[in-house]
Amino acid sequence: MKELMFDEKIMELELAGRTLKVSTGKISRQSSGAIVIQYGDTVLLSTANRSKEARKGADFFPLTVDYIEKFYSSGKFPGGFNKREGRPSTNATLVARLIDRPIRPMFPDGFNYDVHIVNTVLSYDEINIPDYLGVIGSSLALMISDIPFLGPVASVIVGYKNGEFILNPSPKELEESELDLIVAGTKEAVNMVEAGAKELDEETMLKAIMFAHENIKKICEFQEEFSKLYGKENIEFEKPEVLTLVKDFIDTNGYERLQQAVLTTGKKNREDAVDSLEEELMEKFIQENYPDVPEEELPEDIILEFKTYYHDLMKKLVREAILYHKHRVDGRTTTEIRPLDAQINVLPIPHGSALFTRGETQSLAITTLGTKEDEQLIDDLEKEYYKKFYLHYNFPPYSVGEVGRMGSPGRRELGHGSLAERALSYVIPTEEEFPYTIRVVSEITESNGSSSQASICGGSLSLMSAGVPIKEHVAGIAMGLIKEGEEFTVLTDIMGLEDHLGDMDFKVAGTKSGITALQMDIKITGITEEIMRIALNQAHQARIQILELMNNTISKPAELKSNVPRIQQITIPKDKIAALIGPGGKNIKGIIEQTGATVDITDDGLVSVFAKDADTLEKTLKLVDSFVREVEYNEVYEGRVVSIMKFGAFMEILPGKEGLLHISEISPERVEKVEDVLSVGDVFKVRVISMEGGKISLSKKKV
C-alpha cells in the first residue's frame, strides 16, 4: 500500500510577538482555495468555492460567508438534548457578517458567480480571538483560488490601555481595555471598522484605526507573497456591456425627467415617481422596438438590461447632484440632520418607553426591568456566562410599507441590535449600582435609513424613562460618502437612498464625552484617513445636536414605576449562609413559598431579594433577617409556643432559636397551670432576660 503524500505549503509571519502560520495543500484539497490559519493555538479552516456557471439576471453579488463554531475546538460539549451543534449562535452570525463586510467590495464588477466562503473554528486557545483571523483566512483562500478577487484584505484587533495601543489583545486584555476595535483593509486603505469604546475621543479613535492599518499592510504583503507562490490562475469572465439600444432610449426619453423624479419630496412619493416613470418608459420602449411581440415572449435579457440601466442612471444622477452641486434629494445640506422628535412614556404599562423619530425613520423603544432569573445565558466557545443588559432590534416589513414574513431575526436584525446594544452598554450601571436585569426592545415602526442609530437614541431615552441610572445619554448618527476619483463629499445623517447609492455607511454613537460604538462599511475598496477624520468630526457635531434634544426631553432617570419588581441587596456573614439556606434548602424554599419573592445568595454572602411590590419585599427581608440574626439580651422578639411543660413553655423566637418562658414570667398574676393560659402555636412578644450558659430565658410580663 502506497503512503499518501501531501503537498503542503507553509508560511509564517511574526505578529504582535506571536507566530501567524498559514498552510494549504493538506486539508480540504478539493476546495478552490483552502487555508489553515493558526495563531497561537487557535486554528481556523477557511475555504472558498464558486459555482460552475454565473448567475444570470442577478442584480446583486451572490456571496455567502459562514462562520462555524465547533465546541470541540475549546474542549467543550454542545448543549441541548442532541449534544450537537445546531443553528449558528448570535455570535457566529455576527462574525460571519464581520468577515463578509470587508470581503464583499473586493470582487470585480460584473462577476456574478455564486461564491461560498466557510470559516470553521477547529481549535480555540481562549487567548487568540478567531474573529479577525476569519478575515485573513477568507482573503487568502480567495487569493489562492481561481476566483477573481481584488485583495488581499487583512484584519486586526486593537485595544487601548494607559495611553498605549495593544495589537491583537486577548479576551482578558480586552476586558480591561478602553477600546475594542476591529479594523480590516487593504494595503492602500481601510474598508471596515467595528468598535466599542469607553467614551473615547475622535482623535484617539482615528489614531487607533491608523495603528491597525499599519499592521494590516504587513499581513497583506504576507498574503501577496504566499499567493504568488501557490495561487491558481483566475477564471475568465465576461462583464456585460450596456446595450446601445437601451442606453440611447433612456438617455433620450428619460434623463431630464428622472432628474426631476429623484428630487421628489418624501420617500414614498419619490419611489412612486421613479417607479411610474420607469413603467412609462418601459411601455414606450416596447412599443417602439417590439410592437408585435406578445408580453410573455419579450426577451428577458432586454427587460433586465432596461431595468439595470435605469437604476444605474438614477444612481448616477443622485450621486452627481450631491458630489458636484451639494444637492441632496430631500433638499438638505451635506451636514444637516433630518427633523427630530423625541417623546417618553408613550406606553402606559411597560417600565420605560420612548418614541424617537428622525425624518422618516422611527424607533419605538421599550425597556423592561427584571430579576437575575431574566438574565440572558450566553454559551460560547470560551465560557458560559449571563448578560444583565441586552437589546433586541425588530424590523417588520410594515416599517417600509411592504408585505413580508414575520419570523425569527435575520443576520441584519441581529447585527443592528448588537451595534445598538454595544453603544448603550458602556453607560449601563454596574450590578452593585442597579441590580436589575435590563432588556431594551427597539421596534422599527418607520424606516428610511439609520434605523440602528434611531434604536440607540430611542433606547437611551427609554432607559432613562424606566429609571435606569445611565451615566448620560447616548446618541447615534450615520455618515455617508459619495466619491468619484479624488472628488468626495461626506454626508451627515444619510437616508435610505443615500445609503443604497452611496459608497459608505459610517455609524458613530456616543455621549457628549466620547464615542461608545463605531461601525463602518464601504462599497469601494477603501477610504483614506482624511475622509475618516471629516466623517468623525461631522458625526461629533451632529451627535451633540441630537443629545441636546434628548436631554431636553429627559435629562435624569425617572422614578421606578409601581409595577417594576422591587429589589434590595443585603450582605450577611459568610458563616450565616448555611443557616439561611437550611438543610436541603428548607429555609430558603420556605421564604420563597411564603412570600412569592425570589431570593438569590452568592458565596460571598450577598443576598438579593426580588419582590413584586414594596410590602412583599419588606416581608421577605424580615424573614431573611430572622434566619441570620443573633439573639440579643434585653431585646423583644415575637415568639411562638412550640411546647408546654409544667414549669413553663418553650418558645421559638428566631428560626432554630428557642428559649424558656418560665411559669413565673408569664403574667404579673400567679399562674397555676401553664396550659390554662397558653397553647401550642400561640404567638406573642417576649423579652430576653437571661442568656447564661447558652440557655435563653424569656419573660412575657416584662415586655
Swiss-Prot record:
| Catalytic reaction(s) noted | RNA(n+1) + phosphate = RNA(n) + a ribonucleoside 5'-diphosphate
Keyword list, A-Z: Cytoplasm, Magnesium, Metal-binding, Nucleotidyltransferase, RNA-binding, Transferase
Q: Which residues form the signal peptide?
A: none
* Name this protein carries in UniProt: Polyribonucleotide nucleotidyltransferase
Keyword check for ATP-binding: no
Q: Which residues form the KH domain?
A: 565-624
What's a Pfam family this protein contains?
PNPase
